[in-house]
From Swiss-Prot:
One MF annotation (Gene Ontology) recorded for this entry: metal ion binding
Record-annotated active site: H167 (proton acceptor)
Pfam families: An_peroxidase (PF03098)
Binding site for heme b: H172, H392, R489, R493
Record note on cofactor: Binds 1 heme b (iron(II)-protoporphyrin IX) group per subunit. Binds 1 calcium ion per subunit.
Gene label: PIOX
Enzyme class, spelled out: oxidoreductase
Cofactor: heme b; Ca(2+)
Keyword set, alphabetical order: Calcium, Dioxygenase, Fatty acid biosynthesis, Fatty acid metabolism, Heme, Iron, Lipid biosynthesis, Lipid metabolism, Metal-binding, Oxidoreductase, Oxylipin biosynthesis, Peroxidase, Plant defense
E.C. number: 1.13.11.92
Residues the UniProt record annotates as site (Transition state stabilizer): R269
Transmembrane segments: none
Name of the protein this chain belongs to: Alpha-dioxygenase PIOX
Signals that turn on the gene: Induced by the elicitor harpin (HrpN) from Erwinia amylovora and infection with E.amylovora. Induced by infection with the bacterial pathogens Pseudomonas syringae pv syringae and Pseudomonas syringae pv tabaci. Induced by salicylate (SA), wounding, jasmonate (JA), paraquat and 3-amino-1,2,4-triazole (3AT).
Length: 643
C-alpha cells in the first residue's frame, strides 16, 4: 500500500520538480502540506522577481507566506533546552539585569552569555578561513575609493541608531588566544596594516548532538535597552543613581564620565560620539518616565520606579526602531504597511487605540498578544543575524558640523562650520570632542548629513587601522583591520557563504556573477578575487554587490533575515505580549509608549527647539533638510509601487 502511495505521490509531484529549483527538492519533500503550498507561491514570485512590485496587500501576503516558512525552517536552537523546569512570570514582572526569567519555560533564554542561535545549519569553513585572503577581499572589494551616500533617505542619526541597537543585542565572547592575519604581497602596499592580531571567537561545547559547538552572546539579546542599562547586575549598579529610579546623566545632557575618564553607560565598548549621544538621550527618556510615574504614583518605591521606567523606555526604543527607523531603511509602501502591522496589526493604530488588541498577530499585531510565541525554539539572536548587520559602510570619513547659531535657510538647512574626522569621534577622544560640541550641535549635524551606502568600495579606510576596546572601554594595544576581520569572522563562525546562505533562506542561488550585478567592473573584480566559483563568494561582499530593491538601503538577502528576526524580537518576548499591560507597565507607562510614534517625539520631549528650528523632514532618520512626506490620498493597503 505504501508503495502505491509513494508512486501516486511521485506522479503528482514530478511536474513540480521541473518547476522547483533543484536545490530545493530535498527540503520541499520534507515540508508539511501548508508549507509546500506557501513555498510554491513564494518560489513562483521569486522566479518572476515580483514581490516588491506587487500592490501593497499582495506584497504583504507574500511576506507573510515567506515569514511562515522561515519560522518553520529557519529557527534552530543551539545548546540544551531545560525540560520540566518552569518559573512563574508573576515572580518577575520586570526586566531582569541579565535577561533571565523572561521565558517561563526556559529561564536562561535571551540572557547574558546564552548561545547565539542559528537561522540555518553551520557550514564548517575552518580549512577555508583564509580562502580567499580576507585582506585581499577587503582591499579589492570593500575599501572605500570615493564616499557614496544614501541621498536624502538615511542620515547619520540612522547610522548611529543601528549601533545603538547592536549594543543592546549582540556581541561575541572572545577567546584568550590571539590570531594574526598578514596582508598578501599583492595588496600589502594598499593595506593600512601589513598584519594585525585579534582574539578568536570562543567556541563552547553545546552538549547537543546536532550543533556541537556554539558561541556566547555577552549582551542580552532581548529588546531590553541594555545599551543604557547593561547586561548584568554589576553594570546596572554603576549606571543607576538609586534615587527616584533614575540613571546617571551629567548636567549638560551627556553621559557622565567616571574617575578613569570613561563614560558611564550600559555598554561602553567601541563607542563613538553618535552612539553615546543616543545613549544619553534615552537616559533622559528613562529619567523623564521616572518623573512622570512618581508624580502619578507617589507611593511607588525607588526600585519599582526604575523597573517600570525600564520597561517603558525599552518599549519606546523597540517601537521607534519598528515603525520609524526600519520604515526609512526600507522606504516602500509595502514595508511601511508591514512594519506598522508588526506593531499595530492590519487593523491599524486607530482601531487598536480604541478597541485594544483584537484577533491574533495578523489583525492586532505582535504587541499585546495574549501569549508569547517562539515556535518551539528558545529565543536568541543568531549568527546569521549578526552577519547581515555588518553595516560599517554607513559611516563617512568626516562628520560635518553645522552652525546652529546661523539663521536656517530653505528647508531648515544650516551652513557648515567645519568637518571633524570620524577617528576623532571614537573612544575616549570622541567623548572629549562630544563634550566640546555639545548634544544639540552633534544631533543637528548628524540629522543634516547623509550616511554611507551599503555598497562595494565604500568601507571606511580609517576602520582598516582601528583601535578596538575591551568590554570596559579600555583601548587594546593591537590595532585591527576591521574590514578584513569581518570577512574572517563570518567564516570562523561557520556562517554560510553568500550562495549557500541564499539557499538556506529559500532564495534562488546565483549561478554566475552576472546574476548578482550588471556592473562590469564588479563582475571583473569578483572574478579576480574568487575566480569563477560563485560558491566562494563571501556573504558580506555578495550583499554589498547585490542589486537593491528600489527604496531599500539593504540587500534583499539581508532583509529576509530581518523579516523573521524583527518579528521574533517582539513576539517571543512576554513584555511585548502577555505582559504588555497596565499591571506590568502601569497605566501611565503604557500611555507613554502608546503615544510615542517616532524618534522625533522623543527629541521633542527633551529638546523641542531641535526639531522645530532645524528639522524639515518627516522622520528624524532621513536627512533633515529633505521635503516632508507628501500626503497620499490612496489608502496604504491599496497602493501600487511605481514600476
Amino acid at each position: 500500500m505504501s508503495l502505491v502511495m509513494d508512486s501516486l505521490k511521485n506522479l503528482l509531484l514530478s511536474p513540480l520538480r521541473g518547476f522547483i529549483h533543484k536545490d530545493f527538492h530535498d527540503i520541499f519533500e520534507r515540508m508539511t502540506l501548508l508549507s509546500k503550498l506557501l513555498f510554491l507561491i513564494v518560489h513562483l514570485v521569486d522566479k518572476l522577481n515580483l514581490w516588491h512590485r506587487l500592490p501593497v496587500l499582495l506584497g504583504l501576503l507574500y511576506l507573510g507566506a515567506r515569514r511562515h516558512l522561515h519560522q518553520e525552517y529557519n529557527l534552530i536552537n543551539v545548546g540544551k533546552t531545560p525540560i520540566g523546569v518552569r518559573s512563574n512570570p508573576a515572580d518577575h514582572p520586570y526586566r531582569t539585569a541579565d535577561g533571565k526569567y523572561n521565558d517561563p519555560f526556559n529561564e536562561g533564554a535571551g540572557s547574558e552569555l546564552s548561545f547565539f542561535g542559528r537561522n540555518m545549519l553551520p557550514v564548517d569553513q575552518h580549512n577555508q578561513l583564509k580562502k580567499p585572503d580576507p585582506m585581499v577581499v577587503a582591499t579589492k572589494l570593500l575599501a572605500r575609493r570615493n564616499f557614496v551616500d544614501t541621498g536624502k533617505q538615511f542620515n547619520m542619526i540612522a547610522a548611529s541608531w543601528i549601533q545603538f541597537m547592536i549594543h543592546d543585542w549582540i556581541d561575541h565572547l572572545e577567546d584568550t588566544k590571539q590570531i594574526e592575519l598578514k596582508a598578501a604581497e599583492e595588496v600589502a602596499s594598499q593595506c593600512p596594516l601589513k598584519s594585525f592580531k585579534f582574539f578568536k571567537t570562543k567556541e563552547i561545547p553545546t552538549g547537543f548532538y546536532e550543533i556541537k559547538t556554539g558561541h556566547l552572546n555577552t549582551r542580552t539579546p532581548w529588546w531590553d535597552g541594555s545599551a543604557i542599562y547593561g547586561s548584568n547586575a554589576e553594570v546596572l549598579k554603576k549606571v543607576r543613581t538609586f534615587k527616584d529610579g533614575k540613571l546617571k546623566l551629567s548636567a549638560d545632557g551627556l553621559l557622565e564620565i567616571d574617575k578613569n575618564g570613561k563614560i558611564i553607560s550600559g555598554d561602553v565598548r567601541n563607542t563613538w560620539a553618535g552612539l553615546s549621544a543616543l545613549q544619553a538621550l534615552f537616559v533622559q527618556e528613562h529619567n523623564s518616565v521616572c518623573d512622570a510615574l512618581k508624580k502619578e504614583y507617589p507611593e511607588l518605591e525607588e526600585e519599582d520606579l526604575y523597573r517600570h521606567a525600564r520597561l517603558v523606555t525599552s518599549a519606546v526604543i523597540a517601537k521607534v526602531h519598528t515603525i520609524d527607523w526600519t520604515v526609512e531603511l526600507l522606504k516602500t509602501d509595502t514595508l511601511l504597511a508591514g512594519m506598522r502591522a508588526n506593531w499595530y496589526g492590519l487593523l491599524g493604530k486607530k482601531f487598536k487605540d480604541t478597541f485594544g488588541h483584537v484577533g491574533g498577530s495578523i489583525l492586532g499585531g505582535f504587541v499585546g498578544m495574549k501569549k508569547p510565541e517562539n515556535y518551539g525554539v528558545p529565543y536568541s539572536l543568531t549568527e546569521e543575524f549578526t552577519s547581515v548587520y555588518r553595516m560599517h559602510q554607513l559611516l563617512p570619513d568626516k562628520l560635518q558640523l553645522r552652525n546652529i547659531d546661523a539663521t536656517p535657510g530653505p528647508n531648515k538647512s544650516l551652513p557648515l562650520t567645519n568637518e571633524i574626522p570620524l577617528e576623532d569621534l571614537i573612544g575616549g577622544k570622541g567623548e572629549e570632542n562630544l563634550s566640546k560640541i555639545g548634544f544639540t550641535k552633534q544631533m543637528v549635524s548628524m540629522g543634516h548629513q547623509a550616511c554611507g551606502a551599503l555598497e562595494l568600495w565604500n568601507y571606511p579606510v580609517w576602520m582598516r587601522d582601528l583601535i578596538p576596546q575591551d568590554v570596559d572601554g579600555t583601548d587594546r594595544p593591537d590595532h585591527i583591520d576591521l574590514a578584513a576581520l569581518e570577512i574572517y569572522r563570518d567564516r570562523e563562525r561557520s556562517v554560510a557563504r553568500y550562495n549557500e546562505f541564499r539557499r538556506g533562506m529559500l532564495q534562488i542561488p546565483i549561478s554566475k556573477w552576472e546574476d548578482l550585478t550588471d556592473d562590469e567592473e564588479v563582475i571583473n573584480t569578483l572574478g579576480e578575487v574568487y575566480g569563477d566559483d560563485v560558491e566562494e563568494l563571501d556573504l558580506m561582499v555578495g550583499m554589498a554587490a547585490e542589486k537593491k530593491i528600489k527604496g531599500f538601503a539593504i540587500s534583499e538577502t539581508a532583509f529576509f533575515i530581518f523579516l523573521v528576526m524583527a518579528s521574533r524580537r517582539l513576539e517571543a518576548d512576554r513584555f511585548f505580549t502577555s505582559n504588555y499591560n497596565e499591571e506590568t507597565y502601569t497605566k501611565k507607562g503604557l500611555e507613554w509608549v502608546n503615544t510615542t510614534e517616532s524618534l522625533k517625539d522623543v527629541l521633542d520631549r527633551h529638546y523641542p527647539e531641535i526639531t522645530e528650528k532645524w528639522m524639515n523632514s518627516s522622520s528624524a532618520f532621513s536627512v533633515w533638510d529633505s521635503t516632508p512626506q507628501p500626503h497620499n490620498p490612496i489608502p496604504l493597503y491599496f497602493r501600487v509601487p511605481p514600476q
